[in-house]
Each structure stands twice: as structure tokens, then as C-alpha cells.
């Protein structure tokens, strides 16, 4: 299993990325908001983020995915995306405890306004998204040098969130310090789990198979260059 620390700066998060997470989409906010975002990004610039990743053999069935002998009840939509995969990267990534601590300090500061707190939360969401992309790039560069899917996670498109537990168990139970609640929510909150299949027939993101077409956080696929 590969467990790594990733400096915040390596994620190359921009003010535009955070504005997108807030809901501005392709439009930028006014200069005052951009300055606030920029200042808060500096608050988090020294934190360390983390991921753990392992590769397992597996197979895809019509409504489920089997990884290292463990069956995930992914449902038809996710299984269809992963058709053709014989190996799976399973990962958990997190913004980490340092991020949570700084957010708590911001919330407890009586001078902090609600917008600043909202932006700080959006920065955490952006960290999680960027870590997912970082893991995919790591796979592309060094581990699985061929075509593979984007990451998909329990909770996507009728895949029961309870499958978080067996996913975490594949990575030792509490990978990179992330733990699950009884309701299968992750803590630290700004964390991401997922699977990535090799040799898939199509490359889509979770948003591509989600029926919530009017979600303000919806994104189109961002494909990595295929390697053959």
C-alpha cells in the first residue's frame, strides 16, 4: 500500500477553483470576493494533505464489482462504467487534521464573517477534488501506465454508502487517519474515497452518471491523456 503526504501547494489550487466550488461556475466573483479567497488560500498554504492507495485484482459483474474477493454492491450504472476492468486502485484521501483545526479556529473567531467560513469550507471541498485528480495523475505517471477510469465512490448513483466500510477495510481500516462514523461518513470531513478501474471502455466522472443535472456542483468529465 502506498501512503503519501501531499503539500497543499502541490495541489495548485487557484482562486478560480474555489470560486467554482462556491457555485460561480465559469464566472468569477467580484474583486472583493477574489481577494478574500486569495487571503484564505494563504491561510492553508502550509498544511499537509494525505492519501493511501493500493492495487487489487478484481472483476465486474452486471450489478456489482468484486475487488480482492470483496463484493461491492455498486449497482448497474457504476458497474457499466467499470466493465472491462481487471485491476482496481482503491484509495482514500483527506485534507487532514490541520485543515480541520484551521477551520475550527476560523469559526471560533468572533470577527470572522459567514462568507469567510463558507469559502474555507469550499477550499476543503476543492482540496478533496484536487486530491482525487492527484491520485489519478499518480496512477497515470507511475503505477498503471494505461487507460483507466476516473474515480467513483460509494454514494454515487445508487451505490450504497455502506460500502465505505469494506472499501476502508481493504486499506487497513483507517487509512491516512480517516475514520468512518456509524453512518459511514468520513472524518476529517473533507475526505474522499474511491475506486479506479483499469482498461475500461469509457471514461466518465461521478457527475456524468448522476441524475442531478441541475446540481450547482456538477462538472463535466475532465479526461486525463490515455496511455497505450
Model regions: which residues?
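Active-site helix-to-loop segments that bind/position phosphate- or nucleotide-bearing substrates
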Residues: 1-116
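Generic secondary-structure signature for well-ordered alpha-helical cores
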Residues: 42, 46, 140, 144, ...
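Conserved active-site and cofactor/substrate-binding residues in soluble primary-metabolism enzymes
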Residues: 32, 126, 130, 205
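A near-ubiquitous, low-amplitude feature marking generic local secondary-structure context
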Residues: 24, 74, 106, 110, ...
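Short terminal or interdomain "cap/linker" segment that borders an active site or interface and mediates
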Residues: 146-219
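Short cysteine/histidine-rich zinc-coordinating motifs and their immediately flanking basic loops
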Residues: 219-228
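Internal, well-folded beta-alpha domain core
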Residues: 113-171
Amino acid at each position: 500500500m502506498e501512503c503519501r503526504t501531499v503539500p497543499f501547494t502541490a495541489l495548485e489550487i487557484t482562486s478560480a477553483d474555489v470560486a467554482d466550488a462556491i457555485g460561480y461556475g465559469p464566472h468569477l466573483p467580484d474583486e472583493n470576493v477574489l481577494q478574500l479567497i486569495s487571503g484564505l488560500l494563504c491561510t492553508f498554504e502550509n498544511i499537509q494533505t494525505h492519501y493511501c492507495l493500493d492495487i487489487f485484482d478484481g472483476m465486474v459483474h452486471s450489478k456489482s464489482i468484486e475487488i480482492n474477493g470483496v463484493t461491492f454492491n455498486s449497482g448497474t450504472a457504476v458497474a457499466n462504467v467499470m466493465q472491462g476492468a481487471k485491476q482496481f486502485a482503491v484509495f482514500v484521501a483527506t485534507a487532514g487534521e490541520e485543515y480541520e483545526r484551521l477551520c475550527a479556529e476560523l469559526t471560533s473567531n468572533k470577527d470572522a464573517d459567514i462568507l469567510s467560513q463558507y469559502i474555507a469550507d469550499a477550499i476543503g471541498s476543492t482540496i478533496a477534488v484536487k486530491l482525487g485528480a492527484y491520485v489519478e495523475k499518480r496512477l497515470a505517471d507511475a503505477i498503471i501506465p494505461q487507460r483507466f477510469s476516473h474515480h467513483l465512490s460509494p454514494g454515487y448513483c445508487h451505490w450504497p454508502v455502506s460500502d465505505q466500510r469494506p472499501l476502508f477495510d481493504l486499506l487497513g481500516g483507517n487509512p491516512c487517519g480517516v475514520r468512518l462514523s456509524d453512518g459511514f461518513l468520513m472524518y476529517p470531513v473533507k475526505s474522499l474515497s474511491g475506486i479506479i478501474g483499469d482498461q475500461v471502455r469509457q471514461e466518465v466522472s461521478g457527475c456524468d452518471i448522476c441524475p442531478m443535472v441541475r446540481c450547482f456542483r456538477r462538472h463535466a468529465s475532465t479526461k486525463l491523456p490515455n496511455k497505450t
